[in-house]
Curated annotation (Swiss-Prot):
Residues 315-334 have a biased composition (Basic and acidic residues). It holds the Pfam family Methyltransf_5. Belongs to the methyltransferase superfamily. RsmH family. This is Ribosomal RNA small subunit methyltransferase H. It catalyses: cytidine(1402) in 16S rRNA + S-adenosyl-L-methionine = N(4)-methylcytidine(1402) in 16S rRNA + S-adenosyl-L-homocysteine + H(+). One of its GO terms (cellular component) is cytoplasm. The keyword rRNA processing applies. Residues 315-372 are annotated as: Disordered. Its EC number is 2.1.1.199. It is found in: Cytoplasm. The keyword Transferase applies. InterPro entries: RsmH, SAM-dep_MeTrfase_MraW_recog, SAM-dependent_MTases_sf.
């Protein structure tokens, strides 16, 4: 079922909305009440579309940003009897679900990274294109600010943050420039930091790869909000909470997020049993199957409609019925072994020739017809 974007309220355009709805539909469209978790609610665009599409679905929405929660609450007011919003980070998901009495859920969405609200807010410090205090906290009620990181981290720690979280090859040079500059005067604004980074990076590198400060700002944001540490905890916990045939969809916006997602899913889709056994041992088979071939990328139309979708990578998976999957894998393995045995030297041809007096119409003990 498609969603008319004109019917969705507000100017915010959810990323890959139709694809997310398509992937979640089999899990959320089942008979009876279903539970959908939006682990990164933001402005509520994906949640609004899910609730409009699935009248029996209950929403549990999490966000660490109190301002985003306030906007989403207004946006989702017409679904109020099916909505429960929580001020929480996604690695707190198990605690939230336990408190609400949901041991398992049917669908979960992670739309990672910084939200449109945070990018567009002139006073939050996320954007290098406008001057603002160096805050960068998604939850402005707690935690270190980017200003504190920039002005207090020793050089080795600052360089590590820029190298690991920003994948910035000039990390040591930028860290040195920051340390020198802050000794003269604390760095308190996004514009000053962005200009310092621009001046520090060699001129040829400035002309490629977008804004020179992009990777530095990404690294600081990830450090301030503990994004990767939280995601590393949250993804396995979310997978554990899905019911059989429940589905997880993850939208990531840089390689570090996508890498963590890929690893978390890969761990669940492979067999953990001995490779040389003819049958799958109980408890060793895959517990999920992938719904996407690698990371799905946005199409040209999506990017034209929503430029912020340009860097998105989508991965999705579905929880398997362990009994049914074990039976299918055992049947497939038995079939493969029989085929291999038929072609082993000394076992004869895979095609059985009729013997004298055999009209070729009988069946063997396995119930398979003879070939004439």
């Amino acid at each position: 079922m498609g969603v008319d974007m004109g019917e969705l309220r507000g100017a915010h355009v959810p990323v890959l909305l139709e694809r997310c709805l398509e992937l979640l539909a089999p899990a959320l469209g089942r008979a009876g009440r279903t539970v959908y978790v939006d682990a990164t609610l933001g402005l509520g665009g994906h949640a609004e579309a899910v609730l409009a599409t699935h009248p029996q679905t209950m929403l549990v929405g999490l966000d660490r940003d109190t301002e985003a929660l306030a906007h989403a609450r207004v946006r989702l007011a017409r679904f109020a009897d099916r909505v429960h919003l929580e001020h929480a980070v996604y690695d707190e998901l198990p605690d939230v679900l336990d408190r609400l009495g949901h041991p398992v859920v049917d669908g979960i969405l992670f739309d990672l990274g910084v939200s449109s609200l945070q990018l567009d807010a002139p006073d939050r410090g996320f954007a290098y294109a406008q001057d603002a205090p160096l805050d960068m906290r998604m939850d402005q009620t707690r935690g270190l600010t980017a200003e504190e990181v920039v002005n207090t981290y020793p050089h080795p720690d600052l360089a590590r943050v820029l190298r690991v979280y920003g994948e910035e090859k000039f990390a040591p040079r930028i860290a040195s420039a920051i340390v020198r500059e802050r000794e003269r005067d604390p760095i308190t604004s996004s514009a000053r930091l962005a200009e310092l980074v621009r001046q520090t990076i060699p001129a040829p590198a400035r002309r490629t790869g977008g804004h020179p400060a992009k990777r530095t700002f990404q690294a600081l944001r990830i450090e301030v909000n503990r994004e990767l540490a939280a995601l590393e905890t949250a993804l396995p916990a979310a997978l554990d909470r899905l019911t059989i045939e429940g589905r997880l969809v993850v939208l990531s916006y840089h390689s570090l997020e996508d890498r963590l997602t890929k690893v978390a899913l890969a761990d669940r889709v492979r067999s953990k049993g001995p490779v040389d056994l003819p049958v799958e041992l109980p408890g060793t088979g895959p517990t999920f199957r992938l719904l996407s071939r690698g990371a799905e990328l946005p199409g040209e139309a999506e990017v034209a409609m929503n430029p912020r979708a340009a860097s998105v990578r989508l991965r999705a998976a579905e929880r398997l019925d362990p009994t049914a999957e074990q039976r299918r894998r055992t049947d497939r393995e038995r079939y493969r072994r029989r085929v291999r045995a038929m072609h082993q030297p000394g076992t004869g041809s895979a095609v059985r020739r009729p013997t004298p007096g055999d009209d070729g119409t009988g069946t063997d003990e396995e119930g398979e017809g003879h070939d004439s």
